[in-house]
Amino acid sequence: MTAAGETGIVFRNVSKFYGEVLGVNRVNLTIPPGITSLVGPNGSGKTTLMNLLAGLVRPSRGEVTVLGIPPEEPERLFQVVGYCTQFDSYPPGASGREFLLATLALHGCEPAAAARKAQAALERVKLAEAGDRKIAAYSKGMRQRIRLAQALCHDPQVMILDEPLNGLDPLARAETVALFKQLGSAGAYLVISSHVLHEVDAISDQVIMLSNGYVVAEGQIHGVRAEMREHPLQVRVRCSHPHALAAAVIGHPQMLDARVLEPDAWGSPGLQVTTRDADALYAEINRLMAANRVPGLDIVSIAPADDDAGSVYQYLVGEAGGGA
């Protein structure tokens, strides 16, 4: 049963089977406001999870609620959910504005309110000047943006976004990411599926990692990585005199390995240190510099090398899990 006054997105022991084929199994999640990214290869359960959330399929077992609303109440659910699919399908002959007005009519908006909301949505995705053109004449990136406008035009509290950055040029991509962050900061729930893992790293407040229908990890990427104590941390140090620094740090009990790196695209050489404790490495480098143990040492940057979504996923499921 759904708890009275329940908020958030909740999956309780949810399984979905398509005949004998597993979609997802025994999923227990509470998704908070902000940007949550689903990570996993094709067939891992991402699409099933989004379809369950949108009420497009029903669980075989368990219960899903969205802001306290079960999918068995689609009229209520669709008022709070917007879904941006990756499918390039529109009403024949419709302009961008007509597409949005039709969507808003389905949500029960009066014509005057629908006109205002459609215009606002076009402006948010930078399509105001193209709103009255036929969608069939839009570029791939413009069609992606009108799908996004369709998902947000009725001001939903929950947005389900399937590959929402696909086909966008760099400027439109940056503008769309900024819009997502604005919506997340304002308290909306954004659930995003993306195969571009560096974008997942850049925009996500938390991730849900799936493999073969199971949730294998959830939370902030850095927090998930920090819990994986069986895998020593990899830290990349761009610096002058990397050979001398490697020789100086390798004697520390928390340092397991130090490998000199070739210069990067900006010409900075460096080293990659394998350590049980990144904070101990940072403290050791500070101590070495203060004591001038490596004369002429200049640190350009220090950054973790394996606490991104791709690395964490591979640690969790191994190479057999495939790409996300």
Predicted regions and their residues:
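Conserved ABC ATPase "signature" region
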Residues: 101, 105, 112-130
